[in-house]
Amino acid sequence: DAGLLGDEIITNGRTGVSYGSSTGSLDAILDFYSMCIDKEVKLLNSGSYIKMMPQTTAVNISLYFQTHGRLIPTSTACTSGSMGIGYAYEAIKDGYQDVMIAGGAEEIHPTQVGVFDTLYATSSKNNTPELTPSPFDKNRDGLVIGEGAGTLILEEYEHAKARGAHIYCEMVGYGVSCDAYHMTAPAPEGIGGAKAMINALQDASLEAN
């Protein structure tokens, strides 16, 4: 869609990857757990350790497309993909890259479903699945866990214009913050979220009006 397949910029060091995944393969992690319990390594192979590392997602993309620029793996739970996009934006804004492959991917596993259910974070509308999730409804009751991936191609504006690329939108600011409040719950006053928005507006030189 970006028209960059076969372009030398992919392999000349001016293209990087910034991609998120909250964890590696949980099947591989469970194989190591079995090793500790059973005192055997029969489930392990030369790729087991690599599979369980979250950075493998970004690395595999770089290997597949033979990019030689920055490689930025992000592993920040539910924000892994969005932070990957933010870091890609910064890499281009600061002049380190002209193009970045950015986004996130996650596979689903029964252990993940179990954890969110234990936290009472999942929706209980099993009889009416079409009504959930509904994050902006006052009667919302939780998440619906799924798997998937999303990828954006970020490109320096003048570079994109010069090659006649179809530009969907322009990213002009990015902001991030940390609540430093709780492992799973946001700060009740919304300070962290507000700070992230303020940082993004300041980065974009925009007023909140």
Task: Name each model feature, range by range.
Residues 2-6, 37, 65, 92, ...:
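Structural signal for hydrophobic packing residues in well-ordered secondary-structure cores
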Residues 129-208:
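Condensing-enzyme catalytic core mediating Claisen C-C bond formation in acyl metabolism
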Residues 14-18, 98-102, 133, 168, ...:
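Short glycine-aspartate micro-motif
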Residues 103-139:
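Phosphate/pyrophosphate-binding betaalpha-module
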Residues 1-5, 54-65, 70-105, 144-165:
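Active-site-proximal alpha-helical scaffold in enzymes
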Residues 1-76, 105-113, 208-209:
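Conserved beta-ketoacyl condensing-enzyme motif
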Residues 27-41, 91-94, 115-126, 188-191:
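A glycine- and small-aliphatic-rich helix-loop capping segment at beta-alpha/alpha-beta transitions
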